[in-house]
């Protein structure tokens, strides 16, 4: 039999001879450099991460990388320390989401992000190892250069000046902009606050609702949408906003999924419930009702999020 070539050049087209069919997997692994057993591939990757003392490994990233490689070879790479000035969540986003790298942390009790990462590569040989490592560092560096530019630009822009720009971001057809949505969220949160004993001031709710979506028009969130809330919190802290507001900018998006944490602050909880209630009502008003197979606006997730928060 002949092992088929691939874009990754895992095989070389060498003819592999089998004495019996049961020799297929072992022969393919030894001579064709393809490990067919996904569990074995994942075990090899996990063992290396454990050896590198990385315990907080993203299981979704681990699963994804397992199925991206045929003969995993972990390589530890290093990028310039100057990029550690970029906020940690942004660095991690660049590494994990875009490049499928595993960030390396130092310290067990208080993990601190380092300027190293682990890339799981295919077809590594002594001759091409350094070339592969240099290539991955070069690609990540380009990402980090962009991230650094966006971060420097965003932190110099007052979040307050971004709020009016939300009027140019569509929430849903027939239901206005994100600016209109945050105004509805403000009214709902004020009502919820009254129903629960006025736990926070009316002014704090108004300010929290105004700021909670402000980073959606930042350059960083435009490039990295999953950082919504986190960017606003970080920029707000630099600009000395009320700590309750900066916390709520991030926490009102929680929980992201059923295993996620819920907001631990009152303002964030009120805004989180109000935001989800608005989304649910708007979707039903717009006939965007979830079915057994479709829920593009995450209505079910919003409902489950409210239940988790109020429990």
Show which residues each predicted segment covers.
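Amphipathic alpha-helical "coupling" segments that flank catalytic cores
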Residues: 1-311
């Amino acid at each position: 039999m002949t092992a088929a070539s691939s874009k990754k050049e895992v095989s070389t087209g060498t003819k592999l001879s089998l004495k019996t069919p049961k020799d297929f997997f072992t022969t393919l692994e030894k001579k064709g450099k393809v490990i067919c057993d996904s569990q074995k591939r994942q075990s090899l990757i996990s063992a290396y991460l454990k050896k590198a003392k990385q315990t907080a490994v993203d299981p979704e990233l681990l699963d994804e990388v397992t199925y991206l490689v045929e003969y995993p070879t972990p390589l530890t790479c290093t990028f310039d320390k100057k990029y550690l000035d970029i906020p940690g969540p942004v660095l991690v986003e660049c590494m994990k989401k875009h490049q499928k790298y595993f960030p390396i942390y130092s310290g067990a009790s208080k993990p601190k992000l380092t300027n190293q990462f682990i890339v799981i590569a295919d077809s590594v040989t002594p001759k091409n190892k350094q070339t592969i490592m240099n290539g991955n560092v070069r690609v990540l560096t380009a990402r980090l250069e962009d991230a650094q530019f966006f971060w420097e630009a965003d932190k110099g822009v007052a979040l307050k000046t971004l709020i009016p720009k939300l009027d140019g971001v569509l929430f849903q057809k027939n239901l206005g902009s994100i600016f209109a949505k945050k105004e509805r969220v403000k009214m709902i949160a004020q009502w919820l606050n009254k129903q629960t004993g006025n736990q926070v001031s009316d002014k704090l709710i108004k300010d929290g609702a105004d700021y909670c979506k402000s980073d959606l028009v930042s350059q960083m969130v435009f490039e990295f949408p999953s950082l919504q809330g986190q960017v606003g919190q970080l920029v707000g802290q630099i600009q000395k906003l009320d700590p309750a507001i900066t916390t709520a900018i991030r926490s009102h998006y929680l929980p992201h999924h059923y295993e996620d944490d819920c907001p631990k602050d009152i303002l964030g909880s009120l805004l989180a419930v109000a935001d989800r209630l608005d989304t649910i009502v708007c979707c039903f008003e717009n006939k965007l009702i979830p079915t057994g197979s479709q829920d593009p606006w995450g209505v079910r997730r919003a409902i489950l999020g409210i239940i988790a928060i109020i429990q």
